[in-house]
């Protein structure tokens, strides 16, 4: 447990819980007690179990850091100023086209040829051939698969590099070395080296690369210079024409679960999407995938046959094989991703000649080595099935007493934005909120706790905080979430729809100032989401106020708005009661939720944040402040 107070970070039983099932302990026990680390040293502390695990031992090292403060407070810091300059430079590479205006990728290989040209300019074309790459594509679960694979191989003693997308708070999240985001110093070193060389060559018709292409070549630059043993590369979008597909001879390829997403670019059928994903297959290079619908599987198998690729379908990991260890990423669906990661990691070790060196006594393919279990248990990925207990205090209390988590406001964050991932999100959230309520009884969407402490009537309410991009289909996403949760006995008391805080035409850092949201925003999209929600819940939107103008909301709902009961899907007909609200801004919404639990200490709010990774990242930024 990490508690911040009086200028020190106090670590209670530092590290992670012990894995003692079946008398096996994966972590060296440490003496319980408080240990203090001075704050204000420029190091960053993430309070959400973002831990570093040494590649050479089982030692667990807390990833230290604190909020760097506002941009203004650090204006005279050369390192931070240079980092802001880098963010400004990156922002100039963002395409101004809307996603719906993108040209379909079929048959167009100009983009890959450009990436190869940029690699030549940076003298990386031949050097990246020496990288031992695991290349992963997919619709749902490719990021988790990469994280599991990286953690497994790091715990086997290898120096790891991992490139994933998108980032939630800071662009450095996309580049991990040995399980940690690359440092600002190294990021700036490699960034400016690439930037200056490419800028010098941006003549005679060769332009600077778009943002993702630049980040891709930057990742290769980092991994080559850092001399990683393994580079785990996540496809950005699709596969066949993705910027990462300049990798000609990966060690092994993986395809995570496929579904309907990015249809404006990849096509409107599952077969079209599978065609693009299978584009990362290389002749005679082993590939693994998970169980797929037949329409997708047929395309994957046909592509594999044409390229003489040995393609293996991997079953979800059986929990009993973990010997009592819990996966580091929550949700039953992660067993699918973990199974794929185990196969990818095992194949990588075998093809690089390391398997027998590290595991000379492991003869059975079905057994999972202890180092693999350790990696699976310690994998971390922000914004996917992540739980954050907010620290709520009285702003009028000026005493020096330490802030303590009151347990009244808990955020459940998952960046689900496709029908398949929304269903998985609903199952995870329902399971998570039931986890500590086994002694309680559900009453119309909330839980009454009478077994502990002096609060005999503690009320838990499930709240939805939602936004999605306009290219998504909320008519599919919202009903999928509602029905999945309802089937598990979880009903949302209220739903809150918020506008985006992210600036899509600018790359920001974790230390960037948060927008003040003083300007009124166009909330037309949020009102549409609200109408779809009310129809999903009550079959009508008659309870909504249609006189409100989309740009006219400045007020927040009364605090007792959250005290109502959860409406039941398909309930008896009658006068509908509005179970949702459109909020003017995200920062105001977070403060309003905090005010609600301050005013009612017996209220426990369990807030599911989903629909967009951008929304999840924005909430995490606000919770860090």
From Swiss-Prot:
GO terms for cellular component: mitochondrial inner membrane; mitochondrial matrix. InterPro entries: Folylpolyglutamate_synth (IPR001645), Folylpolyglutamate_synth_CS (IPR018109), Mur-like_cat_sf (IPR036565), Mur_ligase_C_dom_sf (IPR036615). The keyword Transmembrane helix does not apply. Pathway: Cofactor biosynthesis; tetrahydrofolylpolyglutamate biosynthesis. It comes from the Eukaryota. Mg(2+) 1 binds at residues 165, 234. It catalyses: (6S)-5,6,7,8-tetrahydrofolyl-(gamma-L-Glu)(n) + L-glutamate + ATP = (6S)-5,6,7,8-tetrahydrofolyl-(gamma-L-Glu)(n+1) + ADP + phosphate + H(+). The keyword Mitochondrion applies. It is found in: Mitochondrion inner membrane; Mitochondrion matrix. GO terms for biological process: one-carbon metabolic process; photorespiration; seedling development. Disruption phenotype: Vegetative phenotype does not differ visually from wild-type. No obvious defects in root development. Polyglutamylated folates still detectable, but loss of activity leads to a significant reduction (45%) in total foliar folate abundance compared to wild-type. The reduced total folate content is a result of reduced levels of 5-formyl-THF, 10-formyl and 5,10-methenyl-THF, 5-methyl-THF and THF (42, 42, 53 and 48%, respectively) compared to wild-type. The plastid and mitochondrial folate levels are also reduced by approximately 50 and 55%, respectively compared to wild-type. Keywords: ATP-binding, Ligase, Magnesium, Membrane, Metal-binding, Mitochondrion, Mitochondrion inner membrane, Nucleotide-binding, One-carbon metabolism. Its EC number is 6.3.2.17. Its cofactor is a monovalent cation. A monovalent cation. This is Folylpolyglutamate synthase.
């Amino acid at each position: 447990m990490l508690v911040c107070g009086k200028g020190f970070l106090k670590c209670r039983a530092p590290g992670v819980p012990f894995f003692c099932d079946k008398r096996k302990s994966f972590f060296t026990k440490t003496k319980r007690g408080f240990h203090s680390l001075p704050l204000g040293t420029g190091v960053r502390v993430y309070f959400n179990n973002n831990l570093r695990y040494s590649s050479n031992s089982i030692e667990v090292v807390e990833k230290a850091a604190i909020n760097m403060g506002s941009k203004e407070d650090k204006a005279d810091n050369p390192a931070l100023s240079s980092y802001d300059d880098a963010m400004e430079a990156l922002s100039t590479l963002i395409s101004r086209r809307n996603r719906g205006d993108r040209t379909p990728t079929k048959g167009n290989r100009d983009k890959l040829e450009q990436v190869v040209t940029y690699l030549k300019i940076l003298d990386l074309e031949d050097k990246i051939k020496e990288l031992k790459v695991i290349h992963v594509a997919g619709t749902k679960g490719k990021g988790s698969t990469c994280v599991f694979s990286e953690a497994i191989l790091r715990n086997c003693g290898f120096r790891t590099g991992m490139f994933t997308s998108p980032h939630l708070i800071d662009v450095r999240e996309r580049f991990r070395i040995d399980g940690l985001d690359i440092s600002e110093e190294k990021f700036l070193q490699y960034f400016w080296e690439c930037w200056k060389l490419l800028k010098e060559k941006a003549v005679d018709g060769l332009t600077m690369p778009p943002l993702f292409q630049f980040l891709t070549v930057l990742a290769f630059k980092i991994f080559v210079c850092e001399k990683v043993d393994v580079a785990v590369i996540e496809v950005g979008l699709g596969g066949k024409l993705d910027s990462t597909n300049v990798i000609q001879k990966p060690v092994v390829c993986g395809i995570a679960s496929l579904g309907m997403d990015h249809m404006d670019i990849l096509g409107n059928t599952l077969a079209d999407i599978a065609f693009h994903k299978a584009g990362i297959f290389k002749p005679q290079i082993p590939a693994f995938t998970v169980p797929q619908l037949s329409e997708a599987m047929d395309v994957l198998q046909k592509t594999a046959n044409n390229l003489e690729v040995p393609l293996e379908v991997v079953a979800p990991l059986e929990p009993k094989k973990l010997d009592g260890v819990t996966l580091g990423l929550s949700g039953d669906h992660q067993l699918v991703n973990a199974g794929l990661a185990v196969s990818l990691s095992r194949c990588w070790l075998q093809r690089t000649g390391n398997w027998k060196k590290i595991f000379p006594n492991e003869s059975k393919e079905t057994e999972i080595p202890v180092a693999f279990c350790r990696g699976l248990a310690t994998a971390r990925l922000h914004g996917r099935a992540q739980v954050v207990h907010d620290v709520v205090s009285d702003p009028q209390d000026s005493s020096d007493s330490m802030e303590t988590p009151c347990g009244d406001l808990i955020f459940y964050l998952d960046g689900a934005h496709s029908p398949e991932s929304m269903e998985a999100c609903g199952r995870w959230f329902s399971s998570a909120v039931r986890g500590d309520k086994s002694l309680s009884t559900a009453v119309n969407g909330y839980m009454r706790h009478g077994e502990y402490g002096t609060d005999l009537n503690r009320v838990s309410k499930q709240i939805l905080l939602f936004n999605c991009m306009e290219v998504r289909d909320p008519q599919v996403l919202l009903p999928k979430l509602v029905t999945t949760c309802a089937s598990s006995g979880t009903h949302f008391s209220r739903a809150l729809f918020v506008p985006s805080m992210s600036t899509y035409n600018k790359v920001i850092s974790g230390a960037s100032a948060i927008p003040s949201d003083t300007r009124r925003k166009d909330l037309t999209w949020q009102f549409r989401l609200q109408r779809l929600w009310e129809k999903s819940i009550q079959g009508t939107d008659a309870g909504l106020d249609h006189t409100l103008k989309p740009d006219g909301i400045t007020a927040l709902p009364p605090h007792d708005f959250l005290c109502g009961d959860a409406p039941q899907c398909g309930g008896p007909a009658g006068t509908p009661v509005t179970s949702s609200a459109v909020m003017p801004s995200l920062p105001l919404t977070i403060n309003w939720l905090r005010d609600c639990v301050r005013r009612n200490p017996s209220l426990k709010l369990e807030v599911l944040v989903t629909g967009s990774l951008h929304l999840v990242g924005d909430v995490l930024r606000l919770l860090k402040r």
